[in-house]
Structure formats: C-alpha cells, structure tokens
Amino acid sequence: MRQLKRVGVFLLLPFFVLIDAHISQLLGSFFPHVHLASHFLFLFLLFETIEVSEYLYLVYCFVIGLVYDVYFFHLIGITTLLFILLGAFLHKLNSVILLNRWTRMLAMIVLTFLFEMGSYLLAFMVGLTVDSMSIFIVYSLVPTMILNFLWITVFQFIFEKYYL
C-alpha cells in the first residue's frame, strides 16, 4: 500500500503543477495589477519529505521542475535547478522544519522567497525578464509571499491530519 501511495503521488505531480498554475491565473484575474504565484506545491513537498526517501524526493523535484519549466518558461533549466536545490535543502532539514506549525510556516515563507528570488535572478540573467528588482519585489514577490502564507495557514491542518 505504501508503494502504491508513492507511485500514485508521483504520477499526479504534473497535475498538481497545472492546478497550481490555474489557481494563480484565477487569482490574477481578480488582482490584475499584481502577479500572484500560488506555490501550494511547496506545502505538498514540505510534508512529502516524511513519506519518501531522499532520492525519490529529488526525482519528484526534478519532474516538478521540468513540468514547471516547460509550462511557464518554455526553457528547461531554471525551475528544475531551483526545485532540486530547494528539495535537497528541505529533505536535509525536515526533522527541524516539521517540529511545529511555526517552523513549517517559516519554511513556507523562506521557500517561497528563495524560489521567487532565484527564478527572477536566473530569468534576468538569461534575458527572460527586464523588470527592475523594485518592480519585482512590490508587484510580484510580496503578494506571492502573502498568498502562500495564507495557503499554509489554511491548509496546514489538512496536511497534518494526512501526513502526521
């Protein structure tokens, strides 16, 4: 049963990415002047460190990164690299991060910040964006971090029931 759970979750990962993207697009239609990026997927990855080995977890991160790259950037490499690095960071520190709710909330905020800032910097270096850092912070980073803080505040209890 445990193996079935691992394989089933692995097959559903691309759909989780697409659902996350559509949530972001839906929220963006309500707030057209800011760029909201839902990273509900980070909440899933945070708790998934409990269930799978480190290597399988990094495969999860690699697949999510590939799907994310193809769907959003049409350039393979930016989020694949970031997801693998963040996944390794999460898996190494999961015993500390999963101690209580506050550390999970802080981890979600830090993950969102590192991912958004890393993807902005890599996209800027590759030439995919020309926005200045201040525009990015005000109209994208801060609203995204607030949204993801709300996600973990609301959905953390559901994930705790399932995983803990």
Swiss-Prot record:
Transmembrane segments: 7-27, 30-50, 70-90, 106-126, 135-155
Annotated family: Belongs to the MreD family.
Subunit-level organization: Interacts with MreC in the elongasome; interaction requires the 90 C-terminal residues of MreC.
Cellular compartments annotated: Cell membrane
Topology versus the membrane: Multi-pass membrane protein
Keywords from the named record: Cell membrane, Cell shape, Membrane, Transmembrane, Transmembrane helix
InterPro entries for this protein: Cell_shape_determining_MreD (IPR007227)
Recorded name of the encoding gene: mreD
Protein name, UniProt field: Cell shape-determining protein MreD
GO cellular component: plasma membrane
Pfam families, sorted: MreD
A biological process term (GO) from this entry: regulation of cell shape
Statement: the UniProt record of this protein carries the keyword Methyltransferase: no
Described purpose of this protein according to its UniProt entry: Involved in formation and maintenance of cell shape, probably part of the elongasome which synthesizes peripheral peptidoglycan (PG).
